[in-house]
Amino acid sequence: MKKVDSMNILDIIENIKIKTIYGSLPTKVNNISQDSRKITKGDVFVAIKGYTVDGHNYIEKVIAQGAALVIASRYEDYNVQDCAVVVVKEHEIEKIASMLAKKINSGNKVHTVAVTGTNGKTSISTLVHNMLRELGESSSYIGTNGFGKNDDEPIYLGNTTPDVVTLHNKIGELHREDIKNLAFEASSHAMVLGRIYNVDIDVAIFTNLTYEHMDFHGDMQTYAYDKSLLFSTLGNNFSEAKYGVLNKDDEYYSIMSKCLYHQEINYSVLDEVADFYAYNIKQYSENGRYKTTFTLKSPEGEYECQTNYIGDFMVSNVLAAFIAVWLKGYSVEKLVNILPNLGALYGRMEILGEDLPIDIISDFAHTPDGYKKLLEATREIRKNKRTLLLTGMGGGRDISKGPLIGEIISEADYVVITTDSPRDEDVEVLMGTIEKGMTHKNYEKVWFRTDAVKRIIQLAEPGDVVILASKGREDYEILQGGKKVWHSDPVVAIEEAKKKFNVK
């Protein structure tokens, strides 16, 4: 890990008004982390009490490793001869951690786009990144697919939105490497749990709000409120231009609009008075590749657009990303011209194995609305063809959506129900939640996902469409006891299909 510049510790903690200090504060610190394994001499350790791990259990360990400062919400009789422990209110610790992390990273200012919504976060943040790269700008992204810089392979971070210290450290890393842009996914969990505190956001995007995470939020109104917290991060400082980009087609649009104190730019595929409106949407196939065209009405006039994605919802995602990049000062015409150059989004309506006699589509759909849009978007591809669909329910997730998912995916001719990182939950219960909603008997259950992918490919015949849903490009499964094993839907499916159809 690259060291950050040391700075005076008194400058770091001067704004923390309610605290108790044990030991002597150091005059300088180096890095900051919530992960005890990353602490070395002169570092700051933030002891967060999480759902499964309590950082306070590692305070003695980090002191032995040479930590200069520990931020905690409770104190025991630690040996603080060479370390200071600052105790603060438990519900304030993420805020204070963000202040420290931001200051240690020298303000870590990069142009930042944050995307929130039930569906579309990964697609939009990736599109923003890809558009900026196509325009020759340095860029990065953080989200479900990990942390990626420019054209490098992403590094897996664990959560869609990492903890607040990691997020600030990554932004600081970008600043030091002179990478000018960041697009990141802001999950509702992240906002409630304080993972984006003190991040300077320039553009905040809202995609949509549909049934999901009820085990965490409780009801849709609370879910909407928690999503709207993103716009509070823009603050009331108007010395720098900040914007909210909102999907006018979503039923929660008006709530988000009211929570936005900065300028709003909205988009739609239904409302012609939206700031950016896409209509005349058409999907077609060219040399085995599926494309979408549409007419764009914008503040700079109307333009004919072409993308390499399918589905009206992907047009909405393109509009959101398009606006975020347009707000940097590019002309609409210039951005329209680069759209055909943008390649497939890994695991998002991704069509695999073009040399195979079957169509294989990989998608991350994992909510009722996501499945509905997935099936709508692929309807033209599936026309007069047999559709086989694989889906899985994850462990440690909201399973109340299972029956509705089962009902929606019953549109497919045949379904293979499996799991998606079952963790410590009963696989029969997980699969059973989806099974409850099935409206026909043309399905089977195969709990281990690798076997399930192989099974659905074995069932496929030339001309069929195989949809692999709920996982996208994730390359692992988490099993009982937290055991992590390799698995990739696309890799397993293509290998199995090539064997079955004797394709080299």
Which positions does each model-derived feature cover?
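ATP-dependent carboxylate-amine ligase
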Residues: M1-T20, K41-V44, A320-G347, I351-K504
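Glycine/threonine-rich flexible loop motifs
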Residues: T52, H56-Y58, L193, D215-T222, ...
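Acidic, Mg2+-coordinating active-site environments of NTP-dependent enzymes
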Residues: E76-Q81, V203-I360, E435-H440
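Short glycine-rich anion-binding loops that position phosphate/pyrophosphate groups of nucleotides
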Residues: G50-Y51, E76, S188-H189, Y211-E212, ...
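Short acidic/polar active-site loop segments enriched in Thr and Asp
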Residues: A68-L69, K180, D202, D413
